[in-house]
Amino acid sequence: GDNHDLWVNPKDGNIMVQSNDGGANVSFDGGRTWSSQDVQPTAEFYGVWLDNAFPYNLYMAQQDNSTYIVPSLNAPFNMDAVKTGPGCETGPIIPHPSDRNIIYGNCKGQFYVQNVAAGVTKAYWIGGQSLYGNDGGDLIYRMQRTTPMATSPHDPKVLYYGSQYLHLTRNNGVHWEKISPDLTAFPKCCQGGSGSPITR
């Protein structure tokens, strides 16, 4: 999705490269067939996080695709070594600081916990609501597209999550505490819906 550019080889019009938010696709037959985005190392990432393993792993939220976990020692590149994580394109995706089986993810305000050993991913709405189709003034918690999320450097059980408030969980997102006042100005002029009827 979200196509950006199309390059056509000036010496051979059958060779084309089409770039988009998810990476790039290549055609050698004038656009009749296209390669997968997974066959070349092209991507746009919202952010990259690392774990404490040795060798370490990279946790990445890829625009228009998904979240990925890639070992740092992956040369030559092997797609079979790439794992899918919790959340979606916006991320972030963050490893638990002391439990390598737990990975936190986010998708536009929805929080996820993946237990790698159990093969289970759980999703939670903080405040129990979807952000889609609602005016900002009607939301209990207003999340950014890329919702801030961070583990505590002092306590591995603590995870912070940001809306207009700062939230804290000690049990992988099952229960949340609101630990700050409203940190935004949020003037009345900005409390309506965003976008147009098509994008709402």
What are these regions (language model features)?
Residues 1-200:
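Beta-propeller blade termini and top-face loops
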